[in-house]
């Protein structure tokens, strides 16, 4: 029988934990416990290391392993970014080491697999559960030679059940908003089975946890896939909402399933979206903005967030932070006086206060005074009571106080910003500079000396050397 590894429960005094974890003294005991449990469940932290003189070193190494997996700064310390990842809802399968008690990399020896829905969640109708499960299997059948057939009785290859807490497989669930589900790799008995926490709120949309998305991830494990370090992959361990109606299996997952089972039987092989690479020399941003000291770089359905104090950069789905925003944002800027961030796509724009959407949005850019001939904004930045909008090779200037366009605009970009002789993809303000991004380059324009003082690669902002 195939089972997830589970480790004995560790019980320690607060002082012992504080010594074992290289963290600030003021860190709450709750955070230490969370980190301890996380490393045990997902990174195979053994209990006896806490009882030895090398415990602090072992914990630091496990923290670094976890930080490496999630592309965080490998500090070996329980910093804010690390704690943030640990608190995200996720899959219950470990990221490190085998989660089976059998050696090797099991796979199904037949391609016509069967599945059975043992029970249902009361939050969705039986038909809704059936549809979500079918769609989740379809994601994998399109990319591989595998087929999936539901059976209503008898022994299936993959059994699907909604269960809670301790449910007899040595991998108990933890209640709402923690571990969402888990699954077992191919094999007899429990092998291939997928369990969903019945205490979670399962939905068909962006609220709470979308059953289709979680099921598709878990079925990847049922077929033999492990977790991916690619934050855009379906097999990434943390939950992130993506629009189900337009969902396409990412290329990383296609590569993974075809490595195990070979290509699809279809004459035309499927291709999927790839996660943008920070150090791609051809990388160009869709939009950039600051937000209360942080810098955001948007690309397709993702954004990089740069922390000025930590000097770290992390990649996230737009939908993870703002499920109401579209992918492919085209412009953004921060209004420092109003403490708002405005984001644009096509003729629509949204306003955020921190991470919260303001009421009454989206609105049409005609509110700024743009004519119907303007169908999209390339970039925007606000400075000294004025907001500059960049559209093709022109710049429009908006008076934030009067809430109208300044007369005499638009003007050509080079006439206003000598040295910026290109279309502007994105821009933000830092110190006495406008940072203009065009293709894979950025131009640092000093608005005091009124000239470009530096031209360099855009991805230097993502810590690429």
Curated annotation (Swiss-Prot):
Binds 3 Ca(2+) ions per subunit. Hemopexin repeats lie at residues 276-325, 326-372, 374-420, 421-464. GO terms for molecular function: endopeptidase activity; metalloendopeptidase activity; peptidase activity; serine-type endopeptidase activity; tumor necrosis factor binding; zinc ion binding. Residues 1-20 form the signal peptide. Its cofactor is Ca(2+); Zn(2+). Zn(2+) 2 binds at residues 91, 217, 221, 227. InterPro entries: Hemopexin-like_dom (IPR000585), Hemopexin-like_dom_sf (IPR036375), Hemopexin-like_repeat (IPR018487), Hemopexin_CS (IPR018486), M10A_MMP (IPR033739), MetalloPept_cat_dom_sf (IPR024079), Pept_M10_metallopeptidase (IPR001818), Pept_M10A (IPR021190). Residues 21-100 form a propeptide. Neutrophils. Expressed in uterus. Low levels in kidney and muscle. Its EC number is 3.4.24.34. Ca(2+) 2 binds at residues 174-175, 177, 179, 197, 200. GO terms for cellular component: extracellular matrix; extracellular space. It is found in: Cytoplasmic granule; Secreted, Extracellular space, Extracellular matrix. Can degrade fibrillar type I, II, and III collagens. May play a role in the degradation of collagen fibers during uterine involution. Belongs to the peptidase M10A family. The conserved cysteine present in the cysteine-switch motif binds the catalytic zinc ion, thus inhibiting the enzyme. The dissociation of the cysteine from the zinc ion upon the activation-peptide release activates the enzyme. This is Neutrophil collagenase. The lineage of its organism: Eukaryota, Metazoa, Chordata, Craniata, Vertebrata. The gene is Mmp8.
């Amino acid at each position: 029988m195939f089972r997830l590894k589970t480790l004995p429960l560790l019980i320690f005094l607060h002082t012992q934990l504080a010594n074992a974890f290289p963290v600030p003294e003021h860190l709450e005991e709750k955070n230490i416990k969370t980190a301890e449990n996380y490393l045990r469940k997902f990174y195979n932290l053994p209990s006896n290391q806490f009882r030895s003189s090398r415990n602090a070193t072992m914990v630091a190494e496990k923290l670094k392993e976890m930080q490496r997996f999630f592309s965080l700064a490998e500090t070996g310390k329980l910093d804010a970014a690390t704690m943030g990842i640990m608190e995200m809802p996720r899959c219950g399968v470990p990221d490190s080491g085998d989660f089976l008690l059998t050696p090797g990399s099991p796979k199904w020896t037949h391609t016509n697999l069967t599945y059975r829905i043992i029970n249902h969640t009361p939050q969705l109708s039986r038909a809704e559960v059936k549809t979500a499960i079918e769609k989740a299997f379809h994601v994998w059948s399109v990319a591989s030679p595998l087929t999936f057939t539901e059976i209503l009785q008898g022994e299936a290859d993959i059994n699907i059940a909604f269960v809670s807490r301790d449910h007899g497989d040595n991998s108990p669930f933890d209640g709402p908003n923690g571990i969402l589900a888990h699954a077992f790799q191919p094999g007899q008995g429990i092998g291939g089975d997928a369990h969903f926490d019945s205490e979670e709120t399962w939905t068909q949309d962006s609220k709470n946890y979308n059953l289709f998305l979680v099921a598709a991830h878990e079925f990847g494990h049922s077929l033999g896939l492990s977790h991916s370090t690619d934050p855009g992959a379906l097999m990434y361990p943390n939950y992130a909402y993506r629009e189900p109606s337009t969902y396409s299996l990412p290329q990383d997952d296609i590569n993974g399933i075809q490595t195990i089972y070979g290509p699809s039987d279809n004459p035309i092989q499927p291709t999927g979206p790839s996660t943008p690479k920070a150090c791609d020399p051809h990388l160009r941003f869709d939009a950039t903005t600051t937000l209360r000291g942080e810098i955001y770089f948007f690309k397709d359905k993702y954004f990089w967030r740069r922390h000025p104090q930590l000097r770290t950069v992390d990649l996230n789905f737009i939908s993870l932070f703002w499920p109401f925003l579209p992918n492919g944002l085209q412009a953004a800027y921060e209004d420092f006086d109003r403490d708002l961030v405005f984001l644009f796509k096509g003729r629509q724009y949204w306003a955020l206060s921190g991470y919260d959407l303001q009421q009454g949005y989206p609105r049409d850019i005609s509110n700024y005074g743009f004519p119907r001939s303007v169908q999209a904004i390339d970039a925007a930045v606000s400075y000294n009571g004025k907001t500059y909008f960049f559209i093709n090779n022109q710049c429009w200037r908006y008076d934030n106080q009067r809430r109208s366009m300044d007369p005499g605009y638009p003007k050509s970009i080079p006439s206003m910003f000598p040295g910026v002789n290109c279309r502007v993809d994105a821009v933000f303000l830092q110190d006495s500079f406008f940072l203009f991004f065009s293709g894979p380059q950025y131009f640092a324009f000093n608005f005091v000396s009124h000239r470009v003082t530096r031209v360099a690669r855009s991805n230097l902002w993502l810590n690429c050397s």
